[in-house]
């Protein structure tokens, strides 16, 4: 039996409720509290860029409107994903998956990547996220943990990894 290679305590969406979820600010705050593994939600922009967001729509955690997966990354990257939480986080952007992955790799943090596809893009999202993760973690001793509540997303990830 192999041993579990990941920390047992995982900071949900970065720093849970302490900072705006799924932002680099949340990851930095979680690390400051001692967390060494993080969970994040990754979906695709309309032009295929993986980025972090839990909800299907933008309204709850940003100043955007509509379905997140219908927007190009150029639009999504300009949104304020911090003000909904508090004024202290105003201007915090939605991060790309690559930015969060590089932060984790640079700081020795493990990552649980929950694949959160836009409905109808389950398999594609799994494929793209898995390819990005494989490229970013190439040569690393401990790969990221890929999870999803969407079986088609996991199937796509399995075939791409």
Language model regions located:
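Phosphate-group recognition and catalysis centered on beta-loop-alpha active-site segments
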Residues: 1-161
